[in-house]
Design a protein with these regions (language model features):
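Active-site histidine-anchored catalytic micro-motif
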Residues: 1-137
Length: 137
């Protein structure tokens, strides 16, 4: 079985950001030489996530508003009693999840017509990483 592991690095300019990473993942899959298998894409931080959805700006805004509605920034999270101020970021990341697995078929990502891979940042303006691990034959 072939494997290839690479890391994508991020340092967003804003506290929350949604970054389309399909092209970077496609390039890593191509570089791996894997024709049939899968790729794991996983945020290596507890205040970030990875998800698959449409790359449409209105939908991205809807996702952001939905997450803010479910886990708004506020000062009274128990987590803040530790001196932190990012309780909402942890909850948003739980809702998005931290990883996706995408099939690789004929050497390419086997995504649906509108499916794209995104990195979701909820506590930005600092260095973060995403691991991309391709496995297969």
């Amino acid at each position: 079985m072939k494997t290839l592991t690479e890391y994508l690095k991020f340092h967003t300019k804003t506290h929350r950001a949604y970054v389309h990473i399909t092209p970077q993942v496609e390039e890593i899959v191509r570089k791996s030489g894997v024709k049939e298998g899968m790729v794991l894409v996983s945020a290596m931080h507890i205040t970030a996530g990875v998800y698959v959805n449409d790359n449409e700006s209105g939908l991205i805004e809807d996702i952001d508003q939905w997450l803010e509605h479910l886990a708004p920034f506020r000062k009274n999270y128990k987590h803040h009693e530790t001196g932190e101020d990012n309780g909402d970021s942890h909850l948003k990341a739980l809702l998005i999840h931290h990883e996706v697995i995408v099939p690789v078929t004929a050497g390419k990502l086997d995504l649906g017509t509108w499916q794209r891979i995104f990195y979701a940042e909820f506590d930005g303006q600092r260095d973060k990483r995403v691991i991309v691990k391709v496995m297969g034959e």
